[in-house]
Amino acid sequence: MEPVAMRVVILQQDIAWADPAENVRQAEAAIDRRPGADLYVLPEMFTTGFATHPEGVAEKADSETLRWMVRKAAACRAAVAGSLAVEDGGRYYNRLCFVHPDGRVETYDKRHLFTYSGEHRHYTHGTRRVVVTFRGVRILLQVCYALRFPVWSRNRGDYDVALYVASWPVGRIEAWSALLRARAIENQCYVVGVNRVGRDPVAEYSGA
């Protein structure tokens, strides 16, 4: 493919625990401070924090947060991406939403759930690899723990960028950095990794 210039802004948000309205307010302000990007990427479960018990905090599939993402993408003429705890059809998903400026929404449900925290007991794992095409760039959508499973992200010549959103604790941050580089090297692709910052009731996060 011909070289394509794309400006990506990663938003390493300090997520307010289980407070979607406050987190959307923070995300909107962060985007507004950084105009002119092609793609804005928010962390894993950016409206709630890494909620391993989604009951009571998960949003509906067609939530106000998703409608905000659609409005923001249109206003910025850019794509907006981030994962949400979603209830859909009576099941819970850790769902990465990629919203195009024209309002199209493409989604990827987290395949590799973090068993150490019990995520698999409450969420349903995804079954599909998802590659979106945006402004001529093919982007593989991935969520957090999938970074440790190289076969799932194997580049079959079908993507240019692997995009990971995460809530990756500071205690394992060296692995985060090393694995991002490894996925880039072995797949001969660009990698974008977006990790949150701050604290929640479970862990501390340092972004990069």
PLM region spans:
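Short amphipathic alpha-helical segment that frequently serves as the phosphate-/nucleotide-binding helix
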Residues: 20-30, 66, 177
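Active-site catalytic loop in hydrolytic enzyme cores
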Residues: 87-157, 170-178, 205
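Residues at alpha-helix caps and immediate loop-helix transition turns in enzyme cores, especially N-
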Residues: 20-23, 53-54, 92, 175-176
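Glycine/Thr-rich phosphate-binding loops of Rossmann-like dinucleotide-binding domains
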Residues: 18, 50, 172
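Short beta-strand segments enriched in small/hydrophobic residues
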Residues: 2-14
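CN hydrolase (nitrilase-like) catalytic-core segments centered on the catalytic cysteine
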Residues: 63-78, 148-208
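Active-site beta-strand/loop signature of hydrolases that rely on acidic residues for catalysis
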Residues: 8-11, 23, 31-57, 73, ...
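Catalytic metal-binding/acid-base residues of hydrolase active sites
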Residues: 14-16, 46, 85-86, 113, ...
